[in-house]
């Protein structure tokens, strides 16, 4: 059965389509900035709400609450855009984002602050998938990978600029609350741009209804998964003591979701016209890419502090090599996929990322002094390896989104885009919770093993020597831990490359006109 696009977008002039996708990308960038903006001002926020600086774990919900709201709302809002139109959902999401920003800026305690961040996350959960769906509506499938890669680049640019944006706002206005007050006029401007650029919704009685029950069950399953994988004391265990019941609850919720979807009349994705094999392959590869991304975001900074003995600012700057490479890779990947196909670029991108992580896993303790010697020239090892990994992960953003959208009918672009992003974000959360907890647990194991191998001191101990010995042991334990973590990440990327072989191709798709 062949489906044709039901949106009027592909008949619009290129200039009008470009303005529309530019407005959507601006909304995506705004949401992405706020995902990472708190990183650079977290200590200011802690002081403002009365949390001691040595209790930083108490403000974890500021970040995780945003991400969980983002993920939980995304499937429902993506499907709502299929039902009610891209313009309306984008505008409602931007309005919700502004409201959440106001609540966050007015916060006087942690509860109010987290509530505002959750509202922001829920609202932001619509911006990326709905804009991706808009790109799929406005461009034929053979040409859309470039557009989707550009949207992905806007998302990744937020990760680069977010911390800098936070510092700039504090420097200009003198308070961290300015970050969120500035969001209000920016959101209003974006709402106006969307109103005048995004095509109006064409009423279609055959459009799918919103599966509220299915979306809620999926949100519960994902939320419990993250809670079950997060260890508050990784020194004792890589998993928390409540892991078994909570993960079991996640499994039950996911099973209930599957049962509901198999019997319900209204589903998140109607099976008619969907090629589930390539679609699930794109989701699985996106999940793996998300896990690799989060392992890098978390652990390069920690490596800088634990192994290279940098302060926080210098350690964060280390990550800039990777973060700058991501959006560049996203733009290049979309352009290449338009010419050579999504499958081949997705596979190559994951293999390049795997090679980058393989190189990172071999970093010596003095990696800042290490170089790659190519005979006629040398390249700094740390910079080069991070750029390789970043380019590789960036390359797959557009092709995986395009491949997933190609194998579903146009009427379900919103929910399909949402599930691709959900898969990626779920991978990020799993990477942060599971590999992060496991990694710190491995640090303490390595630390204790090194201590057991050291000869017992004889005579009166020298305090300075003991301090230096302890420092050297910590650096070695951290280095061994990160080598293991990035080696595992390389394997994950290779597995993702194999999975990407099974995503859709131009030749086998027939859902839309070319």
From Swiss-Prot:
Miscellaneous notes: Bacterial LAM blocks host cell phagosome-lysosome fusion and is one way in which Mycobacteria evade the host immune system. Triacylglycerides accumulate in lipid droplets in the cytoplasm of M.tuberculosis stationary phase and dormant bacteria, and are used as an energy source during starvation.
Kindly list the GO molecular function terms attached to this UniProt entry.
lipid binding; transmembrane transporter activity
Query: Family assignment?
Result: Belongs to the major facilitator superfamily. P55 (TC 2.A.1.3.34) family.
Q: What does this protein do?
A: In association with lipoprotein LprG probably transports triacyglycerides (TAG) across the inner cell membrane into the periplasm; TAG probably regulates lipid metabolism and growth regulation and plays a structural role in the outer membrane. TAG (and maybe other lipids) enters the central cavity of the P55 transporter from within the cell inner membrane via clefts on the cytoplasmic face of P55 between TM5-TM8 and TM2-TM11. From there the lipid is probably transferred to the hydrophobic cavity of LprG.
Name one cellular component (GO) term. plasma membrane
One of its GO biological process terms is: lipid transport
Pfam families from the xrefs? MFS_1
Q: What is this protein called?
A: Triacylglyceride transporter MAB_2807
- Outline the inducing conditions: Part of the lrpG-mfs (MAB_2807) operon.
Record note on domains? Has a canonical major facilitator superfamily fold with two N- and C-terminal domains of 6 transmembrane helices (TM 1-6 and 7-12) and two other transmembrane helices between the domains (TMA and TMB) that form a hairpin. Between TM9-TM10 is a periplasmic beta-hairpin that extends along the membrane plane, TM11 and TM12 helices extend into the periplasm. Asp-34 is a possible protonation/deprotonation site.
Residues at site: Forms salt bridge with Gln-157, probably closes bottom of cavity? 424
Q: Which residues carry the site feature described as Forms salt bridge with Arg-426, probably closes bottom of cavity?
A: 156
> In the UniProt record, does the keyword Phosphoprotein occur?
no
Which InterPro entries does this chain map to? MFS, MFS_dom, MFS_trans_sf, Sugar_transporter_CS
Q: Which UniProt keywords apply?
A: Antibiotic resistance, Cell inner membrane, Cell membrane, Lipid transport, Lipid-binding, Membrane, Transmembrane, Transmembrane helix, Transport
């Amino acid at each position: 059965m062949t489906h044709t696009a039901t949106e009027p977008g592909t008949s619009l002039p290129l200039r009008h389509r470009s303005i529309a996708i530019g407005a959507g990308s601006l909304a995506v960038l705004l949401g992405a900035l706020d995902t990472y903006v708190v990183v650079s001002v977290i200590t200011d926020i802690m002081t403002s709400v009365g949390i001691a600086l040595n209790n930083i774990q108490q403000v974890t919900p500021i970040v995780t609450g945003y991400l969980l709201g983002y993920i939980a709302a995304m499937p429902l809002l993506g499907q709502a855009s299929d039902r009610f139109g891209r313009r309306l959902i984008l505008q409602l999401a931007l309005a919700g984002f502004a409201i959440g920003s106001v609540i966050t800026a007015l916060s006087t305690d942690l509860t109010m602050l987290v509530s505002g961040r959750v509202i922001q996350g829920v609202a932001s959960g619509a911006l990326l998938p709905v804009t991706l769906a808009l790109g799929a509506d406005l461009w034929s499938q053979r040409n859309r990978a470039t557009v989707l890669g550009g949207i992905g680049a806007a998302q990744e640019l937020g990760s680069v600029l977010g911390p800098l944006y936070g510092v700039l706002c504090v420097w200009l206005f003198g308070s961290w609350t300015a970050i969120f007050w500035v969001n209000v006029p920016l959101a209003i401007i974006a709402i106006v741009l969307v109103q005048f650029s995004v095509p109006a919704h064409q009423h279609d009685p055959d459009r799918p209804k919103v599966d509220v029950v299915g979306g809620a069950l999926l949100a519960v399953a994902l939320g419990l998964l993250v809670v079950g994988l997060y260890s508050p004391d990784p020194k004792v265990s890589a998993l928390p003591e409540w892991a078994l019941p909570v993960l079991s609850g996640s499994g039950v919720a996911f099973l209930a979701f599957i049962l509901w979807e198999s019997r319900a009349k209204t589903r998140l994705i109607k099976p008619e016209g969907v090629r589930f094999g390539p679609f699930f392959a794109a989701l699985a590869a996106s999940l793996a890419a998300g896990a690799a991304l989060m392992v890098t975001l978390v652990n390069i900074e920690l490596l800088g502090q634990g192994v290279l003995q940098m302060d926080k600012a210098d350690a964060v700057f280390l990550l800039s090599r990777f973060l700058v490479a991501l959006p560049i890779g996203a733009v290049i990947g979309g352009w290449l996929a338009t010419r050579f196909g999504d499958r081949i670029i997705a596979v190559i991108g994951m293999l390049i990322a795997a090679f980058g992580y393989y190189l990172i896993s071999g970093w010596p303790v003095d990696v800042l002094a290490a170089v790659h010697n190519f005979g006629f020239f040398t390249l700094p090892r740390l910079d080069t390896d991070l750029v390789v990994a970043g380019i590789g992960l960036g390359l797959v953003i557009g092709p995986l989104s395009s491949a997933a959208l190609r194998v579903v009918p146009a009427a379900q672009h919103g929910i399909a885009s949402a599930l691709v992003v959900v898969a990626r974000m779920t991978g990020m959360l799993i990477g942060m919770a599971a590999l992060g907890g496991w990694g710190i647990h491995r640090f303490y194991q390595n630390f204790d093993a090194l201590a057991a191998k050291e000869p017992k001191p004889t005579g009166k101990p020298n305090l300075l020597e003991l301090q230096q010995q302890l420092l050297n042991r910590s650096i070695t334990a951290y280095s061994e831990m990160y080598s293991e973590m990035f080696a595992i990440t390389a394997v994950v990327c290779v597995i993702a490359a194999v999975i990407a072989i099974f995503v859709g191709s131009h030749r086998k798709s027939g859902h839309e006109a070319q």
